[in-house]
C-alpha cells in the first residue's frame, strides 16, 4: 500500500516537470535504462546525474533519481529490528489488468494495465485482506530496490503517532509546546498534538513563498558564507509564525508536518537518533 501511494506521488512530480515541455517522452522512452543514465564506468558526462545538478530532480532524470537518493545525498537506513520481515500471502489476480475506469476529467475509459504506463508508474503493489493480489515494477524500481516515499512519510509518521496514542505514550490533547519546549514560541506552541496530526494548525507558511527557506534549512549542501537562517528543519520549525486559529480548518502544508512528527514521536518515547539530522 505504501509503495502504491509512493508512486502516485512520484507521478505527480513527474507530471509537473513534464508540463514544461511540448512533447514529453513516453513512459517507455523515459525508462532510466533506455535513457542510459549512470550506466558503465565511468558513465559518460551526458549520462551522469549528480545532486549538484540543477535538473537532478527534473523529468526525465527524476525517474532515475527517485531510486538512487542514497547515492546522491547523506541519509540513514532505519532498522526493521531483529524480528525480521513477515512474509505476505500471495494470490495474484491477472484480471485486475482488465479493470476499466474513467479518469477524472476524461471522457473515455482506460484499463488498469493502460494506467500503469500512462502514470509513468515505477511500481505498485495491491493488498486485499492481507494478500498480495497485484505487484508490478518498471523504470528504476525492482522488487528488492529502494524508492523515495516522498509525502507517504506523513502517512507513516501519522500511523506511528496513532499507535503511540493508542498505547498511552502520546497525549494527543497535550500542547505541542509542552511536548517539545523548543517550539513553545513558534506557531506550534499552542496547538494540540491532535491538531498538528490532523493538519488543522494555522501556520503562516506558503509552499511558494517560504519553500526556499525551508529547503535551504534542510539542505545537506554547504550554506553560503553570509547565510544566517536556520540550519536544520528542526531549527526552521522554531521560526514558523501563527497565521490564524488552530483547529478551524484543514490545511495541508506538504513540507511542514513530517519533521514535527518525527521530533514529537521521539520525544514521546524519549528515543533519539545518535545525532541530530537535518532531514
Locate the predicted segments by residue.
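N-terminal leader/targeting segments and the immediately adjacent pre-domain N-terminus
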Residues: 17-141, 198, 202
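Solvent-exposed, polar/charged alpha-helical surfaces in well-ordered, non-transmembrane soluble domains
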Residues: 110, 114, 158-159, 174, ...
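Active-site helix/loop module of the DD-peptidase/beta-lactamase fold
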Residues: 143, 152, 166-208, 239, ...
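Active-site SXXK
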Residues: 130, 147-172, 196, 260-264
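Bacterial N-terminal signal peptides
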Residues: 2-14
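Aromatic- and histidine-enriched alpha-helix N-cap/loop-to-helix transition segments
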Residues: 119, 150-156, 188-191, 251-258
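Catalytic-site signature segments of enzymes, centered on catalytic residues
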Residues: 135-137, 143-144, 208-210, 218-279
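Extended ligand-binding groove/face enriched in aromatic
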Residues: 120-121, 148, 183-237
Amino acid at each position: 500500500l505504501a509503495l502504491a501511494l509512493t508512486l502516485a506521488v512520484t507521478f505527480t512530480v513527474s507530471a509537473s516537470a513534464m508540463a514544461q515541455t511540448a512533447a514529453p517522452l513516453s513512459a517507455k522512452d523515459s525508462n532510466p535504462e533506455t535513457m542510459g543514465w549512470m550506466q558503465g564506468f565511468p558513465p559518460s558526462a551526458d549520462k551522469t546525474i549528480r545532486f549538484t545538478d540543477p535538473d537532478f530532480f527534473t523529468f526525465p532524470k527524476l525517474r532515475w533519481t527517485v531510486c538512487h537518493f542514497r547515492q546522491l545525498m547523506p541519509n540513514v537506513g532505519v532498522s526493521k529490528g531483529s524480528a525480521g520481515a513477515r512474509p505476505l500471502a500471495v494470490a495474484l489476480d491477472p484480471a485486475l489488468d482488465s479493470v476499466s475506469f474513467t479518469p477524472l476529467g476524461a471522457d473515455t475509459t482506460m484499463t488498469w494495465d493502460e494506467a500503469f504506463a500512462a502514470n509513468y508508474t515505477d511500481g505498485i503493489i495491491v493488498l486485499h485482506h492481507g494478500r498480495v493480489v497485484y505487484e508490478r515494477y518498471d523504470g528504476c524500481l525492482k522488487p528488492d530496490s529502494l524508492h523515495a516515499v516522498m509525502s507517504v512519510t506523513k502517512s507513516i509518521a501519522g500511523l506511528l503517532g496513532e499507535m503511540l496514542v493508542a498505547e498511552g505514550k502520546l497525549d494527543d490533547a497535550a500542547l505541542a509546546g509542552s511536548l517539545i519546549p523548543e517550539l513553545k514560541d513558534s506557531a506550534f506552541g499552542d496547538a494540540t498534538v491532535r491538531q498538528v496530526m490532523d493538519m488543522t494548525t494555522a501556520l503562516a507558511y506558503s509552499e511558494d513563498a517560504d519553500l526556499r527557506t525551508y529547503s535551504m534549512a534542510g539542505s545537506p549542501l554547504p550554506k553560503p558564507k553570509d547565510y544566517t537562517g536556520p540550519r536544520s528543519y528542526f531549527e526552521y520549525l522554531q521560526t514558523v509564525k501563527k497565521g490564524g486559529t488552530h483547529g478551524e480548518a484543514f490545511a495541508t502544508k506538504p513540507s511542514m508536518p513530517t519533521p514535527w512528527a518525527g521530533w514529537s514521536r521521539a520525544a514521546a518515547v524519549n528515543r533519539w537518533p545518535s545525532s541530530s539530522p537535518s532531514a
